[in-house]
Amino acid sequence: MENRKELAIVSCCNTNFVPHLAAMFVSILENSPSAAAVHFYVIDDGLSLSSKKALRQTVSSNSQSATVEFLTADKEVYQNFLVSDHITTTAYLRISLPSLLQKYSYKKVLYLDADTLVLDDIVQLYDTPLVNQTIGAVIDPGQAYALKRLGIHSSDYYFNSGVMIIDIDRWNEKAITQKTIQYLEENGDR
């Protein structure tokens, strides 16, 4: 028998994105036969009870081994940060992800934006070795513009935070949550 993996997948969601998140759940469950179980964690940005029920039903009707759990981040931490049509408060909540998962023993988690569709076995992405890196992510194609706007040196990288593999231990060791919040407090107008 092959060694099948249990996966921890995290998303942030508000009520407007519930249909997208449900589609993402189904796309993962239908396209990831090598996963023994998928544990979905949703950082809840004001989901209604009916939305949570719909998401639970989506998961249970598509897999006997998948679960969904809702997590609550302290939104007050992010209330004074720049919000636009491109960056919402919901987007900031992923920064709290490692602290929200402290009671679990995950070494690695996969973060996916709620509107992500998965068309292949997600285990392949989940198994990507991080090789002493805190996250695995894709450099944003608009990096040159973003670097200039954010005042980031060109040797640093601006990445798309919609798909990230996160080494929870390294994230915590390097105090990424605290450093990110500090950066946002000091550069919130960019």
Where are these regions (language model features)?
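Glycosyltransferase catalytic domains, chiefly GT-A lineage
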Residues: M1-R190
